[in-house]
Design a protein with these regions (language model features):
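An N-terminal assembly and electron-transfer interface module characteristic of large anaerobic redox
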Residues: 1-416
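Non-catalytic accessory segments flanking P-loop/AAA+ NTPase cores
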Residues: 403-469
Length: 469
């Protein structure tokens, strides 16, 4: 019997192809898909992920029941190509799950009638969005590289990533550019996001390649024959990145000078927070992460490995089981959860006191401003600042404020607790985030006593306590 998938949060390779190819300035993507598949990827979700109202270089064939049930999609593909062909515009035809199900492989037809149009079999039914991005970038190199030998330009660096649909990419990309420049590198290309299609041939001429994400880009980087680094998270990784890049570019002294300057400027808030009273909270902070691989690994490494906070779980959202995540949230009650919209929904369903911090898709969020990085030195400061400010908010919310209450909310008379009920209450309070334990215990006790009164009892028992927990 097959496993039921709950709240699938990772898109298919069809989405990957659209998000990758449409990021190139001179490419127009033709999707062999129903109009709904166009609207969902190119209009609706694009506005939630990238704050882009729609993709201008994306057109569907608008498959109907006729094409899917009988005639196939070749005729409608040819009609759409005729409308879209224009000088300086490279058309790429992409398969969707629907066209793949009816076996619409247009490779042969295109070679006969439209040899300049390329066909990418997205494998929508077989791969997820990260596998699809990796293969799409490799495919571009195979199709459009000029096959000339590399002419390496000393001191130059190119970045692979991001595409559309990568969480928080404007801020992370800016931080990565800043680190490269500080280490003495001259940025050549950001592929595909700030590039044209044929820039693929120029990537091999860069002295160093930086892969921005652990999720994709490795396949293309491996074809270029250049030294490869990955975008860093946290203190140790960022230091190593700067020094290693400086060494590869023969600019080690420049990199060391930049690192020294960073300690006096960008990293100064980290040192101040570490020496301040806020640092006393750090060992008590319990957090969880559910995000794409780069963020899942990076946040755990920085917050647990370097800041001494307690990581209750860290999941790669492309591989994890959302039912298990919901259960883990319920059982472990993290103080902070870096996650996606499904995780935020689980918190609401469980009435959890956890502070939610967006860290991945799906989920509607605008991150076009450049001040919210997670990567590099700037990312460390932003994340730590968010956590400390959230702790201040929590303290405010847990103050014993005198609220106006309706009659019946304060239990009349004295309510007795059995020793077993008290023991269970203490155990439940211990599992709550440290900073909120007093407030959590007080609220749970109030609810239990109110329920006892409603039931006509003057005693809280273990059975009654479990009814409100």
């Amino acid at each position: 019997m097959g496993r039921t998938v709950r709240d699938e949060s990772t898109a298919s390779a069809y989405w990957a192809a659209v998000n990758t190819f449409c990021a190139l300035k001179d490419v127009h993507v033709l999707a062999d898909a129903p109009v709904g598949c166009y609207n969902l990827v190119g209009v609706a979700v694009m506005d939630y992920t990238d704050a882009v109202p729609y993709l201008e270089n994306f057109t569907p064939t608008s498959l109907t029941e006729k094409e899917i049930a009988s005639s196939g999609s070749s005729e409608i593909v040819r009609q759409t190509i005729e409308k879209l062909q224009a000088p300086g515009r490279q058309l790429i035809l992409v398969s969707s799950a629907e066209s793949e199900m009816i076996g619409s492989d247009h490779e042969r037809m295109l070679k006969m009638h439209y040899p300049e149009v390329r066909f990418f079999w997205s494998n929508s039914l077989g791969e997820n969005e990260w596998q699809g991005r990796d293969r799409a970038l490799k495919w571009i190199h195979e199709q459009f590289d000029d096959q000339k030998p590399a002419v390496v330009e000393p001191g130059t660096v190119s970045i692979i990533g991001p595409t559309y649909g990568c969480f928080n990419s404007p801020s992370d990309l800016l931080e990565l550019k800043r680190l490269i420049s500080g280490a003495g590198g001259e940025l050549r290309h950001v592929y595909p996001f700030e590039s044209s299609l044929n820039d693929i041939s120029a990537l091999k001429n860069s002295e160093v390649i930086v892969v921005m994400y652990r999720e994709f880009g490795e396949a293309l980087a491996g074809m270029l024959g250049r030294p490869v680094l990955h975008a860093p998270f946290g203190l140790a990784e960022t230091r190593e990145f700067i020094l290693e890049l400086g060494g590869l570019l023969n600019k080690r002294e420049r990199a060391e000078a930049f690192l020294k300057l960073e300690k006096q400027t960008t990293l100064k808030p980290l040192w101040d927070l570490w020496r301040g009273p806020q640092a006393e909270w750090f060992p008590t902070v319990r957090f969880g992460v559910t995000a794409a691989k780069s963020y899942a690994l990076g946040l755990k490494q920085f917050l647990e490995g370097e800041m001494g906070m307690q990581c209750l779980f860290s999941h790669n959202s492309a591989e994890t089981d959302n039912t298990l995540i919901r259960n883990e949230i319920k059982e472990k009650q993290p103080q902070f959860l870096f996650g996606r919209m499904p995780d935020k929904i689980y918190l609401a369903e469980l009435e959890a006191k956890t502070r939610f911090i967006p860290a991945g898709f799906p989920g509607p969020i605008v991150r076009r401003a450049l001040g919210t990085p997670f990567m590099g030195h700037s990312g460390m400061i932003y994340i730590l600042q968010e956590i400390v400010n959230a702790l201040y908010d929590m303290l405010f919310n847990f103050l014993p404020i005198n609220r106006r209450t309706s009659s019946g909310e304060v239990p009349p008379g004295k309510i007795v607790w059995t020793s077993q009920a008290n023991q269970i209450l203490n155990e439940m309070v211990k599992r709550a985030p440290f900073i909120s334990q007093i407030s959590f215990g007080r609220e749970l006790k109030r609810k239990a006593e109110l329920l006892a009164v409603k039931q006509g009892s003057d005693t809280v028992t273990p059975e009654l306590l479990k009814m409100v927990s």
